[in-house]
Amino acid sequence: VTRAWRAPAPADAQELDPGAVFEAGLRNHHVSNTAYPIAHGRTWAPYRVAAEDAAAVAVDAWAGIDDLCLYVHIPFCETRCSFCEYTVVKREEAPGVGEYMDDLRRELALYRAALGTESRRLHGFDIGGGTPSFVPAEQIASVVEQARSAFLFAPGADISIETTPRIAAAEPAKLEAYRRAGIERISMGVQVVQPDLLRLLNREANGIACHRQAVENIRAAGFARFNVDLMYGFAGQGLESWRATLQHAIDLGPEYVTLYRMRYKLTRISHQAAEVTLEQVRPLAALAKHMLADAGYTANPGKTTFSRLAGDVGTSSYLARRVQDGMPYLGLGLGAQSFTHTTISYNDGAVGKNLFPYHRSLERGRLPLQDLYDLPLAQMAGKMCAVSFYFGEIRTGPFRAKFGRELEEVYPAAVDLVLRQGLMRRTAGALSLTPAGAEQVNGVIALFFAPSVQRYLVERDPDGAEDLHRNRAASLRVAGEAALA
């Protein structure tokens, strides 16, 4: 497919020394990860589309895209966990659940009318948050039904949803309703099991007391694809406490276990990042890989989801198609991100994290776009490569199909370095991390970022940088302006 990307800004036309970039990624390991881009207010500023043009550019960007995935964001939670970096609204806004779900349906209807979605094939559908299971089950079922009528579901496409242990244990009827609606995969956030750490993270209500009942209810509802999320890399998290968390998760018997390293950026505990070094994190990751392997869970080096089912990658089809194929995805809901071949956009609420601007846009019958970026190949390829590291490899066929160029042609110096230093190797249809590369993934991943992002990393001082911390003043200003508009 021939595509036209906009010309890069001067900052994305430069070439940096790959060795310096690799070292900068390791040095800035808390931000050099799959959460691409970094400092987008600076690195993506040249590509921001004027607000009055955003809707037209968004619709044009979807032209010719027949295969995509869908993500629906539910921003409500019982409590906000201290480690959360996502778009979650305050508990005081919970009474607005009904109105918000109406807005979601309005947004999907707008895209259906603008894009003619009925002829487009959906390859995966994730319902995330927040805590999707916080809202009434009939609201979830209604959104699923609307999505089924708006798109063609491709063979193999599944629907996945997230829950907390407490809700899964206390509200089994919700789980049964999800299965009736056709949701096949469920993910439960265990994260950690130590009481002191749960208290620190504001997750005491989701302690181990409710886990067994939660799993019983999940199985009784008919879920045969069950994932448990765990987190590591917290300040003060020792090897033995992590071992206990891993063993507990294994004993719950899920089909999949997904490991998330704590990223700190924009969280309530971002100030603790300085206490966590790579030397502390690596033994935790190694222990997890060994314990999960001994229990029958496998993953190639660097992959974050471990599966005990042969031939099953373990993730939802939404994430698999995003990561492995760079497939476009449409994001609905507060602050949701959408990705085409040439653009990335963020919905209203991505900054202020309040419902009003999102609701106002939909009430006025317009797409709720806060920011839309028309990006050059260097940035779109950087995004695709960055998320590929969820699976520990970059698939060369999908890269070629998307960009019309070989991976080695776009990244000659990066590919040379990772092969020469044994950080990645050529496998069937992919450039894959080696065990050594997985240990140094923060450096490896930076080699595939766009030059402006690499420059930012090279110049960034991890001890003095403020980008880990949410600019609260800016967030409040955006929220205030939205309320007055």
Give, region by region, the residue ranges found by the protein language model.
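Short amphipathic alpha-helical interaction segments
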Residues: 405-417
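A short, conserved structural fragment
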Residues: 419-429
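Short beta-strand motif preference
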Residues: 70-72, 188, 433
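Beta-strand-connecting loop/turn residues
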Residues: 77, 255, 429-430
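C-terminal scaffold of the Radical SAM
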Residues: 60, 91-113, 121-405, 460-470, ...
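Canonical Radical SAM [4Fe-4S] cluster-binding loop centered on the CxxxCxxC motif
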Residues: 64-102, 199
